[in-house]
């Protein structure tokens, strides 16, 4: 035994569970030592090094990497004598708590070198990887590693968190029992199991380090090591090991051996007793509620005349005004039930009443359905809530469909169509009709309802847009939502066109995840086609849909072949695509196929010279088509050309949803007498990973900034002045400036409420008339690939167009933002209802956290605030956006990346 190293009388194993430690993981980066030799450049010397540590749990990166600060390198004498390359002695706090670590958690450790000779945009320093390694945080027995650890580093050029790591340096059994005992005693001393000898410990430590270095560098391979110190858990004189354990209990468990030990108090052990009734409903409250409601089931005149006092009225008003996404408490449900007859006169209270019904109680259900039919009629936007997954009773869903039929305009049905298609998932018993039972179709001789604009085609032009009388339509619609949609499709070629493509997309997207939904959508699509075939005036629509399908498939084939043949450069691929289009006879004569994106237009032929690929990973194509003019004569209302962007490999359903919200917000604001000059362009997903986007004539702000960079901050304003000079503010036409101010305000509010991410100057477009709009919505609901994104995209150049923050135009901008925010808060339910129906649609940013999607929108609307407080809140967001420095840095980095492409 080494002199002076005496064990304590008892060696109990004291530990805590990892789930009980609510503090962040800490690691001390001490030294980088060894003999470094670059094979490619033997004379290379390291300079300006820093270490970086990234945490991985379940093979996923957790948070951002944490790096050391700058330290001057050691002098040459230390480097030669002690093999010291860099010294930090710095504690790093990692962005994860011990309680959140997974069993397979590990650290990816990298050593980087600054390169002084390359500076990117004066903001980003280039760096070169020197070495890397990974360190498992738990041992094979599930004990968190602690104390000083020599991590062997691999000299590398490319960072790889899953790099194959050699075993951490250890002593060898071949060195003898004494060396083995030495290092075991060192470990015991770090755990406090060896008594300290003050006069001897310094000498022993230096000698141990010399022995360690001798054996560590004895290998012929030139190794480099990073010395780390993992934080230890200590309470008084006792050190505790951290044992991995999954438990949600917050009380820390301290365990000792049976025999106890010096400094260990067995009485400190605490245990948490499980409560099997935790989070369950109180049986007393359940019984009280059942008895109360059972008494009131006897509907007599006395109960019908029950009216709330002032205090109860205030509470009821608060409940009725709650957002549709908020769950009612038991007390709130009982209060609504108690005064249900009083609330019957308020249409918006119906949904809250139906949420208060106990649907497993037959008598209560019977009473609720009878009262529902006597309630004041609700609006179409409130009927959408009754089609969500929260309402499964067929009678309630049938009532919702009947209200859509009576209260919703054809334009509203067309607007809500994606959500209505999603709501089919919650319908019961959607199946093909049995043989002998024909599909219900609309009558050709009964009364009419307003129809959506017809498609200008010889086969469909002038078609009688008829459905059954409202009485018979309600009877047909009372069965299921699918019948309602098919009936509407028969009345409108536009609805049937979009319904067909929405169903096709859902058939493909649910085929792997939920086959029963895919079959259900396939059945409904078959019903739609069968119903169209049966009516003479709708048969042409079936042929039109088949032609569109062939047109889309041909377009995909040509695009894929052009990408494969065109070489590596984007320009060569675009040239190949133009050549292939010019040789494709079927594309030069499209025979008047209806454009799936907008079936109001029929296409005559493609214009090959206009085709090109965008510089992006998926390389979408921009294509222009000649529009077929009716009777061969030019029509002022029909453009000669129609330009689209066709994408493959991108899921357009998220962009489609955002544009639907923009269109809805535009309608809501205009009803509130506020026109913010929004530009809701068309987006249609024609399948999984494919679809059309309407191309609006405009220019990205990035291109404007580059073209007019000589004007610096005034670049956008100078571009507008050159294109539309006038006698208005800043020498620009007055309506152009007004369009810019209003559209900027509108999209700023939309960006904030919907949490649009990845906003840069390439996806902000400006039209010649001054209207600004956003494109490409790959990140929504607060998700953003850039750190610290601003609530609104307001760059200095964009504000300078209005004359700065002290100008009259900027004041108008702020007022428009405030007015729009107030109006949208008053119509929050329709936004929340539409998003709630999309929770199971598989849209990427909603599917990531479906339980939080609605809450994120509700949180940004701040429905808990008064109008005055909401005004202060939105003003704060504007101020925060104006002062966002990180957004400016992100724009610089994005521009640099685009220039490299």
From Swiss-Prot:
Disruption of the gene: reported phenotype: RNAi-mediated knockdown causes a defect in the clearance of apoptotic cell corpses in gonads, a loss of rab-5 recruitment to cell corpse-containing nascent phagosomes and a decrease in PI3P levels on phagosome membranes. In addition, causes a reduction in mig-14 and rme-8 association with puncta structures as well as an increase in mig-14 protein levels. RNAi-mediated knockdown results in reduced germ stem cell proliferation during larval development.
Keywords: ATP-binding, Cell projection, Cytoplasm, Endocytosis, Kinase, Lipid biosynthesis, Lipid metabolism, Membrane, Nucleotide-binding, Nucleus, Phagocytosis, Transferase
Recorded catalytic activity of this chain's protein: a 1,2-diacyl-sn-glycero-3-phospho-(1D-myo-inositol) + ATP = a 1,2-diacyl-sn-glycero-3-phospho-(1D-myo-inositol-3-phosphate) + ADP + H(+)
Gene Ontology MF terms: 1-phosphatidylinositol-3-kinase activity; ATP binding
PROSITE patterns per the UniProt record, alphabetical: C2_PI3K, PI3_4_KINASE_1, PI3_4_KINASE_2, PI3_4_KINASE_3, PIK_HELICAL
Tissue: Ubiquitous.
Stored SUPFAM superfamilies: ARM repeat (SSF48371), C2 domain (Calcium/lipid-binding domain, CaLB) (SSF49562), Protein kinase-like (PK-like) (SSF56112)
EC class of the enzyme, as a word: transferase
Protein name listed in UniProt: Phosphatidylinositol 3-kinase catalytic subunit type 3
Designated gene of the protein: vps-34
